[in-house]
């Protein structure tokens, strides 16, 4: 196994230079963006799930800028964020415009910190994204807490934090966090109660031959609570039938949408992939916002897509397509190619015979214009 992987890696390295020079020629010296670098990432056996998410995040500019800024801060004890900032800095400061980098330090740290990723099985890109964002937020909050205790920054809201157990938001929250409001209306007394909950990404169900807008409408469809699922109404002081729906109250700077393409099939006793065709537009506006939403008319542009290739969650491959300036690129581990915007349609999914292998959008990253 190790010998085969080594041979495969050597063969791959032999083609890297050719791919890099071809990409540089295709973009052209005059069109090549200033201070931009396009570097593939070496796959360490099963790390395409990680590589694809890292490439998508690198081209979410607000996130990249914060990670690079973190690199310039006083040196800290090694953690997942220091390893990520080292990787991003290594890409951003390369003398060459295109090439390949091995994210070995980051992968080693990831496997050390979480046993879920410490093996050579295929992992879920969405699980990794969730873990990475939450871990970075935890690191930043812990560092801020330590700085307050050491007196390096003013106490600010430290008493407030201790009382409410709600730490100050980090730049991860500033970039990715939105707020959902869960509205429940009692059908007896018409009283509406609402409860807010924050999210870093939204997971939406998928159906055949639909669009992201349709999926989001389905996410916010009104649900009737009846029979054994009746709602306890505080006004009526008893269980009543009610209508329930989820709407977006605060729209994030970057909206990460996870398409729930893996479904457990009882008859098969395993998860299977839903390769349904789901159209995701280059521009998006959310229509499932609450009445008191901030910036309900906010427009989003698609900046990155993590694509799953294959027929199931535990096998297959992940790639990323990203928008950089005015063109699109496909990152397939160490291979980087320029693609036409029209080619994105190839990643919507299949219209028929959905049991076939497919290359279908799995995580979408939309960045707001304001």
Swiss-Prot record:
Keyword Protease assigned: yes
Disulfide cysteine pairs (residue numbers): none
Keyword presence, Zinc: yes
GO cellular component: cytoplasm; cytosol; nucleus; plasma membrane
EC id: 3.4.19.12
GO molecular function terms listed in the Swiss-Prot or TrEMBL record: cysteine-type deubiquitinase activity; cysteine-type endopeptidase activity; metal ion binding
Functional note: Deubiquitinating enzyme. Has almost no deubiquitinating activity by itself and requires the interaction with wdr48 to have a high activity.
Quaternary organization: Interacts with WDR48.
Name of the protein: Ubiquitin carboxyl-terminal hydrolase 12-B
């Amino acid at each position: 196994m190790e010998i085969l992987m080594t041979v495969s890696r050597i063969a791959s390295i032999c083609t890297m230079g050719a791919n890099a020079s071809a990409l540089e020629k295709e973009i052209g010296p005059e069109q090549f963006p200033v201070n931009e670098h396009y570097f593939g990432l070496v796959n360490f056996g099963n790390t395409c799930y990680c590589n694809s998410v890292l490439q998508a995040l690198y081209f979410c500019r607000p996130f990249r800028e914060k990670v690079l800024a973190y690199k310039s801060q006083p040196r800290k004890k090694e953690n997942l964020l220091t390893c990520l900032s080292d990787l991003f800095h290594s890409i951003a400061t390369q003398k060459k415009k295109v090439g390949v980098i091995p994210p070995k330090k980051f992968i080693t740290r990831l496997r050390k910190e979480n046993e879920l990723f410490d093996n050579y099985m295929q992992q879920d890109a969405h699980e990794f994204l969730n873990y990475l964002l939450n871990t970075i937020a935890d690191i930043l909050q812990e560092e801020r807490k330590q700085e307050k205790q050491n007196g390096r920054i003013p106490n600010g809201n430290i008493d407030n934090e201790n009382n409410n157990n709600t730490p100050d938001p980090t730049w991860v929250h500033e970039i990715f966090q939105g707020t959902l409001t869960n509205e429940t209306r009692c059908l007896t007394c018409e009283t509406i109660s609402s409860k807010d909950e924050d999210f870093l990404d939204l997971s939406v169900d998928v159906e055949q031959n639909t669009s992201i807008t349709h999926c989001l409408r389905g996410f916010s469809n009104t649900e009737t609570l009846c029979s054994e699922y009746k709602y306890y109404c505080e006004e009526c002081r008893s269980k009543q039938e009610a209508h329930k729906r989820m709407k977006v109250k605060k729209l994030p700077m970057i909206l990460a949408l996870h398409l729930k393409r893996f479904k457990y099939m009882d008859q098969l006793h395993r998860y299977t992939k839903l390769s349904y065709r789901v159209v995701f537009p280059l521009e998006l506006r959310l229509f499932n916002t609450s009445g008191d939403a901030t910036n309900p008319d906010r427009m989003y542009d698609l900046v990155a897509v993590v694509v799953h290739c294959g027929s199931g969650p535990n096998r297959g491959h992940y790639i990323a397509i990203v928008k950089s300036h005015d063109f699109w690129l496909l990152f397939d581990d160490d291979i980087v190619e320029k693609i036409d915007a029209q080619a994105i349609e190839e990643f919507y999914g299949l219209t028929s015979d959905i049991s076939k292998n497919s290359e279908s959008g799995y995580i979408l990253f939309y960045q707001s214009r304001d």
